[in-house]
Structure formats: C-alpha cells, structure tokens
C-alpha cells in the first residue's frame, strides 16, 4: 500500500486490546509507555475525531506519498463520515491493512476500482470500522476508570497515573462537552454527507450516537464515583438531563426504533446515577450524624440550590424523575430541615408516587442483564447509599410496598462486597431498618425475609445468615378472630397463650414447632383481624423443614400452588447458602434430603410448578459439588432423571429400554410453553455430576441422561420455541459445556465390562449421529455473524453480553470437535462427522473455509486460536486439501494469517498456533504450505531454477523470529521461538528442498538457528520455562538431517564453521554434561518430574546427534578420543542411573532410549573406549536392575542391554576370569533365557495355525525366511540372549563355569524343547539359528559337548529337522532368485538352520568321537536323502546357498569317514551311495573350476541375463543386445560373485578328496597283503577329461583334470596379477588371503595324487582286472604323471609353498612340510612320492 509506511499511530482497537492484556505487550513498563503516548487521545475522547476542514483537505492533496485514487477515496470517505480528511485517509489505510478481506496485493487496486470503493461504504464495512474505533476509544477510558483503584489488577499503578493525568486536565469538562455535542447533533442527510447516506445509514448513525451517549454518561458516572462533583457541575448536568428528558426527549427522537429502547433506557439510567452520585449522599449522611451539615458542598451554595429547585420542580412525569426528586428533597431536608419549602415537600411526595423502588429494581436488572462489571457494582453501591439515606430519614410506613423495597435490596446486594458492608453496619440504621421490619412480619410474610437473606449471603457472611435464622426470637401470625385459649390485656395490645399450640398440622413423630403455654404476644390490629408477634425462640431452619413437609402433604390438593410459592424462597435461600459455603451443607440436611421427594411428587401433578422444580434441581446441583455420589444415589431413587429399564448394553447407538423419567414429562411441557428453566437446571446438575468423577458403576447410570442430551436436545434445540431472548444461546452453551466436561474427564481404568463409558458414548454419538452436525452448525455461525452480534450488544465493556455467550459457545464447539477427533478410535471408514467437516462446497462454502476465516475475528484471540487448532487437527487426520477448501479466498486468508503473525502486539498464543498449524501442514498439506512458503522461481542461465522468498512468505516471518539481533524477534518469547524452530524442523524432516535451498542461502541463517546451542542454560526447575530444551532439540535434529541429506562436500561453509566451532568450544562435553544432569534429576525424582516431555525431546535429539556424529566424525569434528570417552561415560552413567530406578515407567523408557545410542557408540568407538571390564561391570548392574522390574514391560530394554553386553564383549578377546562378575552374569543370562524361551514356546503353540506345515516350500534353493512371529525378532530378547550366551561361552575356554550353570539350571533341556517345537512347525527362525550358534560354541569344549549329548541333542533335532526342508520330485528346485537380489548368505533362512545343524553334528563328532558316533550315524541315516541330494545338486545349482550346504555336508562326512567300519556296518548301502556321489561331486567341482565361462554363464542366468541357447563350455557367448551396457559397478559385482563361488568350490573339492581318502587303501598298507574287498574301486579306468554336460562316470581322467586345474590356477596366480582371478583373490579387502588359496590348491593336488596312486595300486592288485587294462593304465599314468611332474617341478622352483596338510599325506619318504620352501624341488615329498610311483609303474 502506498502509504503504509506512514502508519505510526496505534488504532484505538489495538490500544483497547493492549489494555485488556490480550496482546503480547504484558509488561507494566510497556503499558505505561502506551498510556503516555496515547494519553492525550484518551483525554480528548471523541473530540479526537475532528470534523472536516479546508486545511486538512489541502494537506491530503499535498501529500505526495498518497496516490491520487487514495486521496480521492479518502476525501469521499471524509464527507460520508463527517470526519477530518487526514484522519479519514489514515482510517482508510488502517482498515485496508488490518480489516480488509482481500489479499494485500489487491489492496493497491481498491482505491482505483469504483465498485470496490463504493462497496466499502455501502456495505458498511468501512463505517463499522470507524464506529468501532470510536467505541474502542471510550472503552479504553472506561476500562481504566474501572480498574485503576483495584490493587489486584496488574496495571493498576499505570492506570492510576493515567487517571491522575486526566483528572488534572479536566476530563469531566471535556467529556461533558462531547455529550452536549452528541445530544445536539443534527442527523446526517444525503445533502450534507453524500449520496451514500441512506435511511439505513442514518439509522445506524443514530444507534452509534446513542451508544456513545450512554458510554460517555457511564464514564462521567465512574468519574464522579472517584472524584467529587461541584454543585455547579451537577447543576449543568441536571439542566442538560432535563433538556433531553433523561433520554426521552432526544434531538433526533423521530429516528428511535423499538430496537433502540435499551440504549435510550440506558441513557436515562446513567443520568439518574450521575445525579445520585454527584449529590455525594455518603458525605451528607456522615455530616448529618455528626451535626456538621455545613461541611457539605451544597450547604454553602444556596443560589445553586434555588436554581436546582426551579429546574427540578417541573419534573415528575417520567419514572426517571423519581430518584432524582426524592434524593434532592431529602438533601434539602437534611441540610436545613427548618427551611424546607413546600416545593421541596412536593418533590418528595411526587417521587413516592413514581414508584421509585420499582424503578431502581428495573434499572439494576437492566444494567446487570447485559454484563456484570465494575460499572454495575458501582451503580449498586450508589443505590445502596441512596436506600440507606432514604430509610434513615423516612418512616417505613411512608414508603409504599415493603416488597418493592426488598426487591430493590435484592438487586443491590447482588454486587460483591455489599453484603459484607451491610453486616458491618449498625442494625438500626439504613437497610438494617428494612431487615428489622421484615423480621417483624416473619413468618406471616415469609418471602421478604428469605429474599433479603438470599441476597445477603456471601462467602464471608453465609455463616452469619445461618446463625441469624437459627436463633429467631419472634413468630408473627395472623388471626381473623380472637382464639378462646388466649388471655388478653385490657387494651388488647398483649396476648398470652393458655395452652400450647402446634404450628403445623403434621403427623406424630414428624418435625414440628410448638408455641408453649404462657407465651406473650404483641397484638397489632388491622382491618382484617389481628397480627400477633409471639415472643417465641425457634430455628427458622426447622420452620423451613415444616413448610416443606406441609408441601408434601398438600401435593394432591388445590393448595399446592400456594404452598410452592411459600417454599420456593426457602429452596432459593438453601441453594445460595450451599453454593456459597459448602461447609454448611451438613447442617441443612433435613431440608436437602426432602428435595428428592419434592421432585418425585411434584413432577406427577397436573400442572407442575416449573420454577419451583427448577430451584430444586439447582439446589441439588449445588449440593452435588460437595457430595456427588450421595446426590446421584438419592436422585436415582426418585426416577426424576432419565434411566435405563434394562442394564446398559454395549451397543452405544441403541436407546432401547431407555426411559426419560420425570424430567422427560417436564421437558415436553417446557417445549410447549417455550420456557426452559428446568432444562437449564437439569444440564447444570448433570454437568456437576460428571465433573464430580463418579465411580465407573455410577457413571454408567448417567448414560441415559447423556444419551437424552445427545439425541433429543443437541440436534433439535435450535428449532424449539422460545419466549425469552437469549435462552437458546444459553441452552446451547450448557449442552456443550456438559459434553466438554465429559471429553475432558481423566481416563478411567480399563475394565472388563463391555458397557460404554461416557467418553466413548459422546465420541460415538458426535461422530455418527445428528449431534455432530449440530456442533458443526454452531461452528459454522461464521466470523461475520459473530462480529455483527458483538457490535449490536448493548453493553459498554465489550467483554460480556450476548455476543460473549455466542463466542463461548463457538469456542466450546471448537474444543469438542478437536477432542472428538483426537480421542476417537482409529478406523478405516470415514465417519459422518469427518465427512461433514471435510466436504467441499461451492465458492468456499464449507466448514474449512469458515474455520479459516475466524482469523478475521479481533475481539477475543482465543477464538481464532481454537479455530486454527481445529484446522491443525483436521489437517493431521482428514484426507482432504485445506488449500482446495479455501478456494479463491486462500491467498487472502494466508495474508491474514501472516499479518497476525507479523503483528508485534498480536497475542502470543495465536502466533504459536499459526506456526504449529503450518508445521503440520508441511507434512500433510502440500498445496497449502506452498501457498504459505510463497517461493518465487527464476530460471538461471545454466538452465536450473533459482528460488527466492516472496513478499508474503511465512519464511520471512520465521527468519525474523529466529534472528537474535532483530528487536522484534521471538527471543523474548521462548514458546514462540520454539514454534518457529519446530516449523523449520518440519521443512527439513519433510525435505522441502526448495525452501531449504532458500534458507541455506540467507545470511547468518545457520548462526541464528544454532545460537541456542552455544548458550549456557540454567538448570531447569519447577518454575522455569523449559521450551528452550525443545528448541535445542529441534535445532540438533535439523543439523542431523542437513548432514544426512547433504553430501559431505556440499555442506555450506557457514554450517561447517558452526560444526567446527561446536567442537572447538567443547559443546559436545557441555551438552553431554547437561543431558547427563537432566537424566540424573529424573532418576533422583524417580520419574516424577513435570517436564518429562521436554526432557524426552532433548534426550531423543541428543541421541540422534550422537548417532550422526559417530557416522560423520570428520564432518562434526568428533575425533578426539578423550571427548569420545567422556560422551560414552555419560551415556553409560545415565543409562545406569535410569534403569536402576525401581517401578518407574518413565525412567525405563528414557533408559531404553539411552541404551540404544550406547550400543551404537560401543560398536563405532571400540578402539577409543576404556577397558571393557569397567563397561561390563556397569552393564552387569544395569542388567540386574532391569531383571528386577516387571518383565512384561522391559522386554525391549532387556534386548538392548543384551546387545550392549555383546558389543562390549567384542571390544577385545577376554577370558572368563577377566570379565567382572562372570558367574553371576552367566547365571542372570541363563535365568532370563529360561523365562523367555518358555514364553516363546507358549506363544508359538498358541499362534501357529494348524495348516502351517502344508505351506512349506522346497528349501534346497529358496531363502525361505518363514513367517517371523511377533516374539521371534532378530533383536528379540531370546535371540540376543543366546548370542550373549555364545559370547560368554567363548570366554570360558575350559568350560568349567558353564558346566556349573548347566548343572544348576535346566538350560539345555529347555532350549532343546523349544528348538524341537520350533523346527517341527517351522517357526521362530531367528531363535533357531541363535540356539544352534550357541550350541556350536558350547560344543568346542569336551564338557559342553558331553552335556549336550547327554541332554539328547540328536533326539531333539534329528527328526524335527525334516520339517525344515521338503524334497521336490527331481531332487532339487530349479527356481532360484537372482544372486544379486538375494540377502547375504548369513541372513537367517531355514536352509541356514539345516546347515548349522550339520555343522553342529560335525563339531560334536569331532569333539566326542566314539561317544557321539551312534548319534551321528542316526543323523546321517535320517537325512541321507537330503545329503545325497545336496552332493548331486552342485553340478546343476551352483549357487552360494547350495555350495554352502555342500561344504557343511562334506565337512560332516569328512569327520564321519574316520569311522568307516562302523559306518559300513550300520549303513552299508548309504556309504556306497556317498562314495559314488562324492566322486561325482569331485568331477562337478573340477569341471566348474576348469570352465570359468560356464560358471559365469550359470551366474548370469541366476541374475536374469539372457544367454544364447547354443553356448558350450568352450564356445563364445552370443548374447542378445542388452537393454543397457554393463557398468563398472556391475562388472565388479559379477567378479565378486565369481570369486565367492570359486572359493566355495575349492573348499568343497578339498574336503571331498580328503573324505575319499578314507575309502581308498592307505599307501603304506596297500603294498602289504591287504583284503581288497573292503575297498571299492572309486574311479573308472579312463583317462579322458570329462565334459561338463555329459553324465560321465568319474575316472582317473577326473583326478588328472583336477591336478591340471590346480596347477593352472597356481600358475595364473603367480604369473598374471592382473588376471581376473588373481585380482579377485588377491584383493586386500577380500576375506580370502592369497597365501591360503595357494595352500588350499596344493592340498587339493596332494589329495588327488594320493587318490590317483592309491586307486592305481588297487587296480594293479585286483586280479579281476584284465592285464591289458593294467598295462594300458601304467602307460597312461606314466605319461600323464611325467608331464605333471615337470610342471610341478617348475612351480616349486619358482618358490611355491607346500601344502599345510602335507603331514596328513603318508609318504614313502616322510618329509616335514615346514621345509618345503628351503629344500630343492626334488626333495619335495609330493614330487618324491609321484616319482617313486612313476618308477614303480614303469617297471
């Protein structure tokens, strides 16, 4: 806007908001500064707004900062409003800035657009704004006058100085002139104010003037209440009041409409009050009592008094005149009774005839109906003083009706402090005279005394009222005729009873009163008989009880109405006493206990007394605040409340069997009459019972009542008939208050009953029935309607009245909807409430848009705050676009949001809520957040996009809030600062790259963001603001996310400097100490802190910060070992402190969080940590503390402690003696395992379906991970506990400690039982693998292996292991997932379980040998098919999984081959099959190793590549055109796969040949006589190299080919380091060492030669072989071996190593393998052996 920068003056509405404390300016110094700055405006009042002038017009036209269109519009507005031109332009600018409903961009076009300019005035928006400014100015003055003497008000001192200034500068005179000006102002016309001044505008102008007149008079009244008025001031006022007829003869009275009558009456009332206050009656009474009337100001102003007489003598024709005439007449009489003129006497008599007390009653009722503020209290005090003056100076008989006087007193004493003032006065003066009068007529006239005492009850006087009525000394009754049992005095002034008299005709035994014999009574005769006042002492409370009993007796008679009228004041008094002082409730039990019977009896009469019943219900509601359970129980027996005929079922929606009770019949009568006093009382009663937190059983009884409200009242109350204005709004407020109370009940403990509780009932009804739509309709009232109601309410304060009631109702609807959405159970279906909330309407006509537009509401900041809070909730849970719902108003609403966010005086809570809403929108509302981010995009020369912040971007505001150098930043408001940082965190968390890019480029962004991390925080206390902890937590998370997202090199220099500074200034140490101190504080308080949320946020962020720091130590400069040790020590200490606290879920949760980061630090910083002994000692204590807690609550924590112990054991190898408390630690782990395994087995048996076994798949090749159950997790307690047990077992090298534990606890039987169950049903995969790993470690020692064998390990796993795999028809599955897509070979799988079991059998057999042989043979017998299938599958399925299983299988067979005789005896056929399959396996491995291309072909097929169908082992590949060329990464992956497979094949081949040696004759024995029948011929007598794709019988050619392959591989490794195999096998990062590979190749070669020689000798010595074949064999062997010897000799001459298993090979000339490299090649044992054999066959 053109001149927006010129706006420096605060608007009157803003000033009023500041004074009310609804802004961010809450400090007294700020208020003083505002009052000093704008005090002159307050002093001027409405005169601040000047009329148009020529000079002002010239200044506007000369202002170059104003556009011509804005000047023109300002001048037109000046004429229309009759306002100074400069002020009109300023008013227009502020309106466009603060109240205009369009976008700020469109503001510039408003002055140029004729239609929009006219709309500003024709639609009265501009006029309303101007009128509101004028009213706000007067409200500021009123507010200051109301509270400048209130010591409890926070700004009373500042207000007092302002009032002092205004009093010195003659506030009264200025405001009196303004009032005169308003009274005499002519109505505007179209000639004077332009064509826009229509009749409607004139009417609105007149209403505004009436309101201003009333407010000016109210200000003058309050001013006179504080400062004395001079007689001349009063004379001037009186003349002015007479001129305008106390509001009845206004200048423009022809414009008065019926709707304006309350304002006209208000003007008259304040005129009267000003007159009474200006007389200073209190001073007059004080002077009269001391006979110093000459000290009164009017005593010396005789001329003024005469003029006043002449002015007032003509009055008397209007009700307003009564108090004025009587007060003046009494003043004249009090000042000089002897000189009272007839004129004055006439004034007094005229005043009495005007029914002044009825007038005063109406006046106080009218003032209190709209609002009940300080003005009303001051008016009551003024009238109280007047009544006291009147009663002191006039005889009561002169006053008309005693009842009118009591009614006035009833209204007077409604003001606070006045009852106390009355009780502190003399009982014979003032209103004490009235009290004595009504006491004298009691109980003949029952109502006056009760009404007066009802008004006199206050917190400090309730007991006085009770005591006064408890000791009544007289009893007045009326007789038409003189009774016979009376003795009378001669003059009939005294009577004496001759017989006692029972006062109430009640039955025997009932409460009653009895006047005893001889009682004296004073007689006052009247025209109707005798009025006797007996001198009889009694308790009025007993009399009240008798009156209620009488009512119960006459319920069914015609006297019931009359008796109800007598009893109703009693009930009202009891209600007031109980609600004021609950301690008296017990004393009133005889009365309150009879109210239940009254309700029961009176609800059934023909015409129930509705007001009386309403009072009864109100009384019970007050009583229920003290004893809700008793009231509920007693009330339930009456049948008054709705009830369920049958027990409440679990069907919430059903109302079957519900009865409306006695209230239901009354409710129908009220609907027909249009009066709802009982319904309001019923709602108050039920609300009180709900808030009373009844027990769950009693709360169930309230379900019918709540159902009645939700089904009958809430959906329909707005359609009922109403006789009185405002009752509908009051009903809606009460209904919503009840629902709000229910939704805010503290959660009850879960019970087994299926009946619904009150909360679930409300939630279900609101989400699924018409009740929810009714709440939506209330929220849909809209800001325009609400603002209109607020403008039209008659009250002056703006903080009370009908508009406030509507506003509170809408706020309740917001809160209820928010709570319903928050508390409703999760469901996939959309409820009717959610559908109605989120449905789109045309032209923005939907609830979302209505909610968003509440941002335009300016009166109460809590209303838009609650609306935004509901928007936030809907944005979180509702599947809709807020942006789409806003439609074309979206940009304007955004500008309104940001305007309030930018405003430096805006309420802080609104700003916080706006930021929280935007924080949620980042994740859930992409369109809306883009609107608020308002990023402008520019295309750069490089073709990329460059972002910048738009003028109306929320980031502009957020950057300003976090700027520590900006005076308007949020650093003085921690909660606002936290919200701003939380919004930035949401941007990073949702990875809004465009916004992040812009923010990174902003200067000092990272410095401003991270400033809190470099400050020194005070240690938190109960009273400190802890949002700074959350702020720091969000900052840490933003840094972590930035490092995570950005490549290390792309981090901004600014952030790099910050991180370096963070390290250099030792902030790691500082924050570690701070977090550690917080943790210790929580531990010391056992989790009973009030700030756990903030602590948890900071702890979570610190945990993330450390995790990122461990992975990016160089970026975050966390490389100092001492700092690392310090951080880990604090984490470990904090974890220990928290987890050792017993019975605290909070400490357990926080400790579990710390335990996670401790595990990571243990794994990442192993080399920098201190000795593991100290760490293990602390972890052992932590484990003991955790094990003492409820085990169902600490399952995850136990798992994390186990993981930490595992990591600590991995720091360095340790023996059992070096581990602190090793025996106890082992015992704790085993005991925990025992409990967890039992639970796991039970859980498995319950959860697993019966048909699980049928779903098992062929597991030879598939990585079937099974269905991981909830309790069987990789990081579960059982699995980690077993891994920890494995680590502890490895430390016990001798096995002694574990032997003791195994003897003490049944660990092994329990584990075996669980393993058997899991294997049998093929569940708990991770658990099975962990058990087998533990057992494998335990089997390393002889004691452990023996214990396992003794516990029956074979019986446990042998047969159940069959369930793990299932053979296919062809023995192997051909479907295999791609190798590159498969998990690591070490990942849990059922084939892996089988492999581990085979390895375990191998280990046990190796350790126990003959002691385990029988079990081993049993295992082989059971699984022989699988074993044979595995050996044969290598040729067809050369995958890592298959090769790994073959490796384990051959290893087991290698151990078993040491017992060939026993094996042959038990399983003769199997040993033959194994021999055959081993030979074929040898041939398959050799073929695959020989043809690398064929092996690559297999791997590529498994990786999904298309191969040529004509490929041969030696042919060239002719692949189809691939979709993309192979990359360096894919080639490297293929090379690694090839390396792994080749290494596996070599290991299998070595073990296979070693196993076959057991089935061939020993070379040392075969030369001697030997039974050849026990050794089968393993290889065929053929020397042809077998083809891979042919099913060729293994032969000598196979062994020779194997030797050739090994020689070839050895040669390649030595010659070509750049060869693929050499590169792969020679990689420094490879797990396979080059030297070990060579040794393995030599081992294979040795075994080949051994088998070759042994089998050849076996052929030579076999008589069944033809000599010709033997001769051919010799020739072939001689030739082949000679060739191989020459190649072998060349290899050894180059320095090749000898086989590490050379000692295993028997040689004719035994040589040590250790000298292989230093002796000539001829001395190699291998070469010597082969040479000897060649010489032998050549002979």
Curated annotation (Swiss-Prot):
Comp. bias (Polar residues): 1506-1528
Pfam families for this protein: Nup188_N, Nup188_N-subdom_III, Nup188_SH3-like
Compositional bias of kind Basic and acidic residues: 1254-1269
Superkingdom classification of source: Eukaryota
GO molecular function, one term: structural constituent of nuclear pore
Keywords for this protein: mRNA transport, Nuclear pore complex, Nucleus, Protein transport, Translocation, Transport
Primary location recorded for the protein, binned into one broad class: nucleus
Subcellular location: Nucleus, Nuclear pore complex
Region (Disordered): 1249-1269, 1506-1530, 1696-1717
Disruption phenotype: Morpholino knockdown of the protein causes abnormal heart and gut looping.
GO CC aspect terms: nuclear pore
GO BP terms: mRNA transport; protein transport
InterPro entries referenced in this protein's UniProt entry, alphabetically: ARM-type_fold (IPR016024), Nucleoporin_Nup188_N (IPR018864), Nup188 (IPR044840), Nup188_N-subdom_III (IPR048883)
Assembly and binders: Part of the nuclear pore complex (NPC).
UniProt record similarity statement: Belongs to the Nup188 family.
Function: Component of the nuclear pore complex (NPC), a complex required for the trafficking across the nuclear envelope. Required for proper protein transport into the nucleus.
Protein name, as recorded: Nucleoporin NUP188
Source organism: Xenopus tropicalis
Organism lineage: Eukaryota, Metazoa, Chordata, Craniata, Vertebrata
């Amino acid at each position: 806007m053109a001149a927006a920068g010129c706006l420096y003056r605060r608007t009157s509405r803003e000033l009023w908001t500041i004074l009310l404390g609804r802004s961010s300016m809450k400090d007294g110094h700020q208020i003083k500064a505002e009052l000093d700055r704008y005090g002159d405006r307050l002093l001027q009042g409405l005169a601040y707004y000047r009329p148009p002038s020529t000079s002002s017009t010239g200044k506007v036209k000369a202002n170059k900062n104003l556009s011509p269109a804005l000047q023109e519009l300002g001048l037109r507005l000046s004429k229309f409003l009759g306002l100074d031109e400069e002020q009109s332009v300023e008013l227009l600018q502020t309106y466009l800035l603060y109240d205009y409903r369009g976008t700020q961009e469109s503001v510039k076009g408003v002055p140029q657009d004729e239609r929009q300019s006219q709309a500003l005035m024709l639609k009265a928006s501009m006029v309303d704004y101007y009128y509101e400014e004028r009213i706000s100015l007067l409200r500021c003055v009123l507010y200051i006058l109301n509270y400048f003497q209130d010591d409890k008000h926070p700004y009373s001192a500042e207000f007092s100085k302002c009032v002092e200034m205004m009093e010195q500068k003659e506030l009264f005179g200025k405001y009196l002139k303004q009032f005169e000006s308003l009274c005499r102002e002519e109505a505007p016309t179209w000639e004077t104010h332009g064509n826009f001044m229509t009749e409607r505008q004139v009417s609105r102008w007149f209403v505004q003037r009436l309101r201003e007149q009333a407010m000016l008079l109210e200000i003058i009244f309050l001013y006179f209440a504080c400062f004395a008025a001079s007689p001349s001031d009063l004379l001037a006022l009186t003349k002015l009041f007479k001129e305008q007829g106390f509001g009845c003869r206004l200048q423009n009275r022809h414009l008065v409409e019926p709707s304006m009558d309350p304002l006209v009456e208000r003007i008259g009332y304040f005129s009267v009050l000003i007159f009474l206050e200006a007389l200073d009656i209190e001073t007059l009474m004080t002077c009269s009592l001391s006979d110093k009337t000459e000290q009164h100001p009017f005593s010396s102003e005789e001329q003024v008094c005469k003029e006043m007489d002449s002015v007032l003598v003509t009055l008397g024709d209007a009700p307003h005149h009564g108090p004025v005439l009587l007060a003046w007449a009494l003043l004249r009489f009090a000042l000089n009774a002897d000189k009272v003129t007839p004129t004055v006497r006439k004034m007094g008599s005229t005043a009495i005839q005007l029914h002044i007390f009825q007038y005063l009653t109406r006046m106080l009722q009218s003032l209190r109906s709209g609002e009940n503020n300080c003005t009303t209290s001051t008016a009551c005090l003024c009238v109280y003083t007047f009544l006291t003056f009147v009663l002191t100076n006039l005889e009561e008989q002169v006053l008309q009706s005693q009842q009118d006087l009591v009614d006035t007193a009833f209204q007077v004493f409604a003001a606070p402090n006045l009852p106390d003032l009355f009780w502190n006065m003399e009982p014979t003066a003032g209103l004490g005279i009235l009290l004595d009068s009504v006491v004298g007529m009691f109980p003949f006239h029952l109502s006056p005394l009760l009404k007066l005492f009802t008004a006199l009850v206050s917190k400090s006087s309730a007991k006085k009222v009770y005591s006064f009525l408890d000791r009544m000394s007289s009893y007045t009754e009326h007789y038409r005729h003189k009774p016979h049992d009376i003795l009378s005095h001669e003059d009939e002034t005294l009577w004496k009873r001759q017989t006692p008299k029972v006062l109430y005709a009640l039955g025997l035994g009932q409460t009653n009163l009895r006047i005893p014999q001889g009682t004296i009574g004073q007689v006052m005769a009247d025209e109707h008989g005798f009025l006797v006042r007996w001198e009889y002492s009694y308790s009025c409370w007993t009399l009240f009880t008798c009156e209620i009993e009488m009512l119960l007796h006459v319920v069914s008679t015609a006297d019931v109405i009359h008796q109800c009228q007598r009893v109703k004041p009693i009930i009202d008094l009891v209600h007031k006493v109980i609600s004021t002082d609950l301690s008296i409730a017990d004393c009133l039990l005889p009365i309150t206990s009879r109210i239940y019977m009254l309700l029961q009896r009176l609800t059934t009469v023909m015409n129930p007394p509705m007001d009386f019943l309403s009072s009864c219900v109100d009384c019970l509601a007050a009583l229920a605040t003290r004893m809700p359970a008793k009231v509920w129980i007693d009330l339930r027996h009456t049948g008054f409340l709705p009830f369920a005929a049958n027990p409440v079922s679990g069907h919430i929606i059903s109302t079957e069997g519900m009865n409306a009770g006695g209230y239901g019949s009354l409710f129908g009568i009220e609907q027909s009459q249009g009066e709802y006093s009982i319904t309001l009382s019923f709602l108050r009663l039920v609300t009180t019972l709900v808030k009373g937190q009844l027990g769950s059983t009693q709360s169930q009884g309230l379900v019918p009542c709540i159902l009645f409200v939700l089904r009958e009242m809430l959906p329909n109350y707005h359609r009922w008939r109403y006789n009185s204005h405002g009752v509908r709004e009051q009903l809606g407020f009460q209904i919503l208050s009840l629902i709000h109370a229910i939704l805010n009940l503290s959660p009850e403990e879960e019970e087994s009953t299926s009946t619904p509780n009150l909360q679930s009932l409300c939630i279900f009804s609101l989400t699924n029935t018409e009740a929810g739509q009714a709440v939506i309709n209330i929220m849909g009232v809209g800001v325009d309607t609400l603002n209109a109601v607020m403008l039209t309410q008659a009250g002056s304060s703006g903080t009370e009245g009908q508009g406030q009631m509507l506003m509170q109702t809408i706020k309740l609807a917001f809160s209820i909807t928010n709570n319903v959405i928050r508390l409703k159970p999760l469901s996939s279906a959309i409820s009717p409430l959610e559908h109605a909330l989120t449905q789109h309407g045309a032209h923005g006509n939907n609830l979302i848009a209505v909610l968003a537009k509440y941002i335009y509401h300016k009166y109460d900041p809590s209303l838009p705050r609650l609306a935004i809070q509901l928007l936030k909730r809907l944005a979180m849970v509702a599947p809709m676009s807020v942006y789409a719902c806003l439609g074309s108003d979206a940009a304007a609403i955004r500008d309104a949001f940001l305007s309030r966010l930018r405003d430096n005086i805006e309420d802080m809570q609104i700003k916080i809520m706006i930021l929280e809403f935007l924080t949620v929108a980042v994740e859930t509302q992409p369109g809306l957040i883009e609107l608020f981010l308002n990023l402008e995009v520019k295309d750069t020369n490089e073709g990329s996009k460059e972002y910048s912040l738009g003028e109306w971007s929320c980031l502009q505001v957020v950057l300003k809030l976090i700027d520590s150098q900006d005076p308007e930043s949020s650093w003085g408001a921690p909660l606002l600062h936290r919200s701003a940082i939380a919004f930035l965190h949401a941007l990073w968390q949702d990875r809004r790259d465009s916004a992040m890019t812009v923010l990174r480029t902003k200067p000092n962004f990272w410095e401003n963001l991270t400033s809190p991390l470099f400050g020194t925080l005070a240690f938190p206390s109960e009273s400190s603001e802890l949002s700074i902890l959350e702020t720091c937590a969000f900052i840490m998370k933003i840094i972590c996310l930035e490092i995570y997202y950005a490549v290390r090199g792309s981090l901004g220099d600014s952030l790099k400097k910050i991180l370096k500074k963070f390290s250099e200034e030792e902030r790691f140490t500082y924050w570690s100490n701070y977090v550690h101190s917080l943790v210790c504080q929580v531990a010391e308080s056992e989790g009973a802190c009030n700030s756990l949320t903030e602590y948890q946020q900071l702890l979570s962020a610190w945990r993330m910060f450390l995790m990122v720091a461990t992975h990016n130590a160089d970026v975050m400069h966390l490389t100092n070992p001492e700092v690392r040790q310090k951080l880990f020590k604090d984490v470990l200490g904090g974890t220990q402190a928290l987890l050792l606290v017993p019975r605290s879920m909070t400490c357990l949760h926080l400790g579990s969080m710390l335990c996670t980061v401790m595990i990571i630090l243990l794994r990442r910083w192993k080399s920098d940590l201190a000795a593991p002994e100290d760490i293990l000692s602390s972890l052992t204590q932590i484990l003991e503390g955790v094990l003492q807690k409820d085990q169902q609550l600490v399952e995850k924590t136990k798992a994390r402690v186990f993981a930490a112990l595992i990591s600590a054991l991995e720091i360095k190898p340790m023996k059992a003696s070096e581990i602190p408390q090793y025996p106890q630690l082992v015992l704790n782990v085993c005991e925990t395992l025992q409990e967890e395994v039992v639970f796991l087995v039970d859980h498995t048996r319950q959860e697993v379906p019966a048909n699980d076994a049928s779903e098992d798949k062929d597991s030879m090749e598939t990585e079937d991970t099974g269905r991981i159950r909830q309790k069987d997790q990789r990081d579960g307690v059982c699995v980690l506990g077993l891994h920890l047990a494995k680590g502890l077992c490895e430390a016990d090298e001798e096995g002694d400690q574990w032997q003791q534990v195994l003897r003490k606890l049944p660990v092994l039987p329990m584990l075996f039982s669980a393993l058997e169950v899991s294997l049998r049903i093929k569940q708990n995969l991770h658990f099975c693998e962990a058990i087998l790993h533990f057992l494998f470690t335990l089997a390393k020692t002889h004691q452990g292996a023996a214990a396992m064998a003794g516990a029956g390990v074979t019986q446990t796993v042998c047969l159940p292991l069959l369930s793990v795999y299932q053979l296919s028809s062809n023995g192997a599955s051909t479907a295999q997932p791609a190798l590159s897509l498969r998990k690591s070979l070490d990942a849990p799988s059922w084939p892996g379980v089988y492999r581990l079991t085979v390895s375990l059998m191998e280990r046990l057999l190796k350790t126990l040998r003959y002691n385990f042989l029988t079990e081993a043979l049993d295992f082989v017998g059971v699984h022989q098919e699988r074993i044979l299938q595995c050996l044969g599958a290598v040729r067809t399925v050369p995958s890592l999984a298959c090769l790994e299983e073959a490796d384990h299988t051959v290893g087991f067979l290698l151990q078993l081959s040491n017992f060939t005789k026993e094996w042959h005896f038990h399983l003769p056929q199997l040993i033959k099959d194994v021999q055959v399959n081993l030979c074929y396996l040898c041939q398959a491995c050799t073929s695959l190793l020989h043809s690398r291309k064929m092996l690559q072909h297999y791997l590529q097929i498994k990786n999904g590549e298309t191969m040529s169908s004509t490929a041969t082992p030696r042919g060239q590949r002719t692949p189809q055109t691939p979709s993309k060329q192979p990359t360096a990464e894919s080639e490297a992956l293929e090379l690694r796969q090839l390396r792994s497979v080749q290494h596996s094949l070599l290991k299998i081949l070595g073990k296979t040949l070693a196993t076959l040696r057991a089935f061939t004759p020993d070379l040392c024995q075969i030369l001697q006589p030997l039974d050849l029948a026990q050794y089968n011929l393993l290889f065929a007598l053929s020397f042809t190299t077998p083809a891979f794709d042919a099913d060729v019988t293994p032969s000598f050619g196979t062994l020779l080919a194997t030797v050739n392959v090994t020689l070839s591989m050895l040669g390649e490794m030595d010659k070509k380091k750049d060869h693929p195999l050499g590169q792969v096998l020679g990689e420094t990062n490879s797990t396979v060492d080059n030297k070990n590979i060579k040794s393995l190749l030599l081992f294979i070669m040795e075994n080949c030669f051994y088998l070759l020689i042994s089998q050849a000798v076996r052929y030579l010595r076999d008589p069944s072989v033809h000599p010709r074949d033997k001769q051919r064999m010799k020739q072939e062997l001689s030739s082949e071996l000679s060739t191989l010897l020459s190649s072998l000799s060349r290899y050894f001459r180059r320095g090749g190593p000898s086989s590490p298993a050379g000692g295993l090979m028997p040689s004719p000339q035994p040589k040590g393998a250790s000298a292989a490299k230093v002796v000539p090649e001829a001395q190699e044992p291998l070469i010597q052996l082969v040479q000897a054999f060649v010489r032998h066959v050549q002979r």
